[in-house]
């Protein structure tokens, strides 16, 4: 049985059609879908449009920070927040009670609040029953008048066309379908958690369900229903419009898109993951063929089955002439977002919060400049010959370590650069079954770097351990092992408490690179079967080394005897978000392989000769070294120590001791946020640590300029630091290149924290406590929930949502030219997703971007552009 016939909507004869691969991947001509009334519904084109409003978050292993509201980037920031709130049912700003608490704590000052009120006006408060004559009365009204909390209303998925099944027919389809659909998806996409993998994994999702229905001894409800058999044999381009015509009504094709959007947003996590894997199938190590079209087809079939069970096969459509017209969708041009009074007040508080931080941040930098120019500074001696130079990732967590390291010796210099250090590659360690990407997400690397283990006995030992692990999970051998060696598991449990790194669930970037293995970075001209080149040519290496040195301004400084590239990673146990704690510029991987590779490149004599022809001279007395900093344990791992010349051994030992002291001070500084910690507890005695670190929490600013702007200045681990010498960039080309790389990465980190803190349940993942890992691709609440996107509250609870304050050291003319070099950069600053400022350091003038110009800030003025 299929959908019942009617005089107006004839049912086409079912056909067995194998669904084609996604048009985005195969490049095939798109199939259009014919509705029962003869009109055409372009399913694939429609789903491509709708996918824009879904979360764009890949599997856990590739967790990369991004702008949560990327789909609204074309709108000004505040308008985007309002539109997204109406679409997803999320908070637009923090609750008013939270802002009032921040005000009482001094995080919002009267000065900042007064400036915001004078600029934005407050007369509208009188119209809402709070008569005010000056800014103080307006402040008092904001503190005392009951405006509400600004609690968001329901999203489009809870009050749209599809929700009429519940509101008008009394059907709760979600509760009946979601658990079955999610289990099906989890089983099909599983990447190694399930002991028994999904059969027929080479098939597409729809073909997989067909095969199960036809061959399984047990019914796969609801898809095994006789009513759905004809629909199950159709391609999605046929079945989807056929079912929608019954649900929405024939001739109502404009509403098909709306129904599909509401259905996808009802489980946005799974929908977004399916779309990500459709356009990026390489995101799974064990690839699967999934598509939004097949997901929609399966869910609509399930809905149709349950609707027919409850209402019969003849039922009225959800929309008809007697139904009220549906309002425009929040992302459509005709939709006009109107803030509530509570949201208007919250916007004033939010602007005052950002202005308070901005005034404090800029004031510290100007005070630091005054001290430096007075000659009383002891932390920065520009005429002092460098003894050691260390390159760090521009990551905000590395700023405090750089400061503590520089404090050990005025001749120690540090530089900030994107943590992949220009080495765009995939990396495959000695124990890795698959290579992993180690460069920014938008790049498509063509080079592979491998490790080769020097000791073959370790390979044999690793293989034996893997075999024992597999055998322990089989029926017979697992039973024998548990009966004979089961007691050992209790001993291992106790050991894992006192030494957590023994836990098999531990993830550590220090173990990602085998310091005892050899790494080869040089290659010939042969390309491997999978399309990667095994290493780099000398010319390619020279390009990458020169790129780092030139962009950082080091070509204008003499090179020290020892130059260290310090990547960063992390270590944690049973943490699904381990990739979020590693280097974002390395696609959520530790930066150790990149640091090691660029050091090996810079030490090659052939590369140095090529660099010398380009004017980048590396003296023979200079040696490069790679290292990795574990930001959670504050430990350092060095690579290729056996290759360090004897002439540099004493200096290396001095540097290692300096780093040990710096990391001890850094760990102490990190602990200051734990208000109840006892100063008498030794870190080695604190074996229980519920939060390995706060990651990028509290990030708020980014400086692109010389180190002398902030050397010796504590920026509270809230600032990204990228090295740049404006004197070497008269045309702004280097700055434009840096901005194009830094703004999406740092801005994405900032905004993901912003929105995950703003609404921990819609934009964030909520508390980690009920989380379970689903198939190694995502996390869910409980056992049958939607995939959760964004960040958990344990990573954001100390974060204040502030838009990134980006300050570049450059003249206003060049700063403006650089940021207008690409349409994406213009979108970031013109729509107020970040705050863009420049500092003419010599003249001590600061400027802010406002509507295509750089406007000078008056002394003492905080911020002006509000987005």
Identify the role of each PLM range.
Residues 367-381, 549-554, 561, 685-692, ...:
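Generic recognition of flexible, low-complexity loop/linker segments
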Residues 387-389, 416-418, 559-562, 594, ...:
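Structural beta-strand/beta-sheet cores of well-ordered domains, especially the beta-sheet scaffolds
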Residues 394-400, 565-573:
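Gly/Ser/Thr-rich loops at beta-strand to alpha-helix junctions
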